[in-house]
């Protein structure tokens, strides 16, 4: 159930953190660890559960499962699970860099938060993202950011820690909203080759999804002021 899942996730995060503390994790591993920590805090707040207590309970659940699991069954389970790949458009510095907005706008679409600076006008912008893929489709978005040619961050799509879980269609919709909002101010927006390959599959030659003018206008108008 929801509580048990949260407890197990807390314990597994604790194990991964111990691994990272020994300086054994690579950049994608550490990035995912930070994202998962935010997600667990949000879920704990929503469920009204203490993370430390949940971690202990999760340890008991995992230990019980391992006691019942044979080595052969473990090998079969691992072999049957499809492996996902982690793809990076952005460097760790680009992902962790703070950025500021002169005219902040924000919209929540499902479990994704879309932010942009509507003071940006007449710029060439590219969307970059770090995400995992499975079966050649986007599985989980870690972070998407919009960059100007000068390297300034002017927009962002990120998962909400309190609402984990999203589909590739959710990501497509969020990207469409972000593009619509940026194009409203006469910016030219492109999508990175990696995003084109795994998230869009049908795009214009300029590297972005086709959006009818009315749809772009509607998307731009639906972006509400940031609280």
Curated annotation (Swiss-Prot):
Motif Nuclear export signal positions after renumbering to this chain: 134-143
Short sequence motif named Nuclear localization signal, residue ranges: 31-35
Example GO biological process: symbiont-mediated suppression of host PKR/eIFalpha signaling
Region (CPSF4-binding) location: 177-212
Pfam families: Flu_NS1
Main location as per UniProt: host cell
Segments of this protein annotated with the region PABPN1-binding: 220-227
Modification comment: Upon interferon induction, ISGylated via host HERC5; this results in the impairment of NS1 interaction with RNA targets due to its inability to form homodimers and to interact with host EIF2AK2/PKR.
Tagged with keyword Ubl conjugation: yes
Taxonomy, superkingdom: Viruses
One cellular-component annotation, GO: host cell cytoplasm
GO terms for MF: protein serine/threonine kinase inhibitor activity; RNA binding
Keywords, ordered alphabetically: Eukaryotic host gene expression shutoff by virus, Host cytoplasm, Host gene expression shutoff by virus, Host mRNA suppression by virus, Host nucleus, Host-virus interaction, Inhibition of host innate immune response by virus, Inhibition of host interferon signaling pathway by virus, Inhibition of host PKR by virus, Inhibition of host pre-mRNA processing by virus, Inhibition of host RIG-I by virus, Inhibition of host RLR pathway by virus, Interferon antiviral system evasion, RNA-binding, Ubl conjugation, Viral immunoevasion
InterPro entries: NS1 (IPR004208), NS1A (IPR000256), NS1A_effect_dom-like_sf (IPR038064), uS15_NS1_RNA-bd_sf (IPR009068)
Compartment(s): Host nucleus; Host cytoplasm
UniProt record similarity statement: Belongs to the influenza A viruses NS1 family.
Note on domains (UniProt): The dsRNA-binding region is required for suppression of RNA silencing.
Function text: Inhibits post-transcriptional processing of cellular pre-mRNA, by binding and inhibiting two cellular proteins that are required for the 3'-end processing of cellular pre-mRNAs: the 30 kDa cleavage and polyadenylation specificity factor/CPSF4 and the poly(A)-binding protein 2/PABPN1. In turn, unprocessed 3' end pre-mRNAs accumulate in the host nucleus and are no longer exported to the cytoplasm. Cellular protein synthesis is thereby shut off very early after virus infection.
Description of how the protein assembles with itself and partners: Homodimer. Interacts with host TRIM25 (via coiled coil); this interaction specifically inhibits TRIM25 multimerization and TRIM25-mediated RIGI CARD ubiquitination. Interacts with human EIF2AK2/PKR, CPSF4, IVNS1ABP and PABPN1.
Protein's UniProt name: Non-structural protein 1
Organism: Influenza A virus (strain A/Mynah/Haneda-Thai/1976 H3N1)
């Amino acid at each position: 159930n929801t509580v048990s899942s949260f407890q197990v996730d807390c314990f597994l995060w604790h194990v991964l953190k111990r691994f990272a503390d020994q300086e054994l994790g690579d950049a994608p591993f550490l990035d995912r660890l930070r994202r998962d920590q935010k997600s667990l805090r949000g879920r704990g707040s929503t469920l009204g559960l203490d993370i430390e207590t949940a971690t202990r309970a999760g340890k008991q659940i995992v230990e019980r499962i391992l006691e019942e699991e044979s080595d052969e069954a473990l090998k079969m389970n691992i072999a049957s699970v499809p492996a996902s790949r982690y793809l990076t458009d952005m460097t760790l510095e680009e992902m962790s860099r703070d950025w500021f907005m002169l005219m902040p706008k924000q919209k929540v679409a499902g479990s994704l938060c879309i932010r942009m600076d509507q003071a940006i006008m007449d710029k060439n912008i590219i969307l970059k993202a770090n995400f995992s893929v499975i079966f050649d489709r986007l599985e989980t978005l870690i972070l998407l950011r919009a960059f100007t040619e000068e390297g300034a961050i002017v927009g962002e799509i990120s998962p909400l820690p309190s609402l984990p879980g999203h589909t590739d269609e959710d990501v497509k919709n969020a990207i469409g909203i972000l593009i619509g909002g940026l194009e409203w101010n006469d910016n030219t927006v492109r999508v990175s080759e990696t995003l084109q390959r795994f998230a869009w599959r049908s795009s214009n030659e300029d590297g972005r999804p086709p959006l009818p003018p009315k749809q772009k206008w509607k998307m731009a108008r639906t972006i509400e002021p940031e609280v």
